[in-house]
Swiss-Prot record:
Matches recorded under Gene3D superfamilies: NusB-like
Species of provenance: Chlorobium chlorochromatii (strain CaD3)
GO cellular component: cytosol
Keyword RNA-binding listed: yes
UniProt xrefs under HAMAP family: NusB
Pfam families: NusB (PF01029)
Keywords for this protein: RNA-binding, Transcription, Transcription antitermination, Transcription regulation
Its job: Involved in transcription antitermination. Required for transcription of ribosomal RNA (rRNA) genes. Binds specifically to the boxA antiterminator sequence of the ribosomal RNA (rrn) operons.
GO BP of this protein: DNA-templated transcription termination; transcription antitermination
Gene: nusB
Protein name: Transcription antitermination protein NusB
């Protein structure tokens, strides 16, 4: 079952694609794609509005990161779907503080598999996002909190040696 965040990501991807093909505003395109289910859920609408407004506000910055990583490619040569999936994931990585970057990247890969422009779209999206994320992390530009922390360990803490039990033979 898709989460509401996956549904919203897919709707925003469709809106971004429509904007490039039809030359309408992102707000117009996104408004056409909202479902009753999303409109009725306050958490879904909060995420939708955050992602949409962040993409609009930071598109030039996001495109610069993509252009720096794809320096051998002109942005116009990158498939529209792939470019917009990367835009959306980078926006989440940079501006959605509670979403772990690996979740954003994984969601982008899964969406690329579904909406693939080529059979290698998911690998292309993964490679570009991974490279940009590593660069941003090295430069200290990724700021996460709560559930979005980058290096949060999920392993069990080790018992202190004083509490360890010895096995007698």
């Amino acid at each position: 079952m898709k989460t509401y965040r996956r549904q919203i990501r897919e709707k925003i991807l469709q809106a971004l694609y429509t904007v490039e093909l039809r030359g309408i505003t992102l707000d117009e395109a996104a408004g056409w794609l909202l479902t009753e289910e999303i409109l009725a859920d306050p958490n879904a609408m909060k995420f939708f509005n955050l992602l949409l407004s962040s993409i609009k506000a930071h598109r030039e910055e996001i495109d610069n990161y993509i252009a720096q990583q794809t320096f051998n490619w002109d942005m116009s040569r990158i498939a529209i779907i792939d470019k917009n999936i990367i835009r959306m994931a980078l926006t989440e990585i940079l501006y959605c503080e509670d979403i772990p970057p690996k979740v954003s990247i994984n969601e982008a890969i899964e969406i690329a598999k579904k909406f693939n422009s080529t059979d290698k779209s998911s690998k292309f999206v993964n490679g570009i996002l991974d490279a940009i994320f590593n660069k941003l992390k090295t430069e200290g530009k990724v700021h996460k909190n709560g559930r979005g922390l980058i290096d949060q360990s999920f392993s069990r803490p080790q018992k202190p040696e004083s509490e360890a039990t010895e096995i007698e033979e």
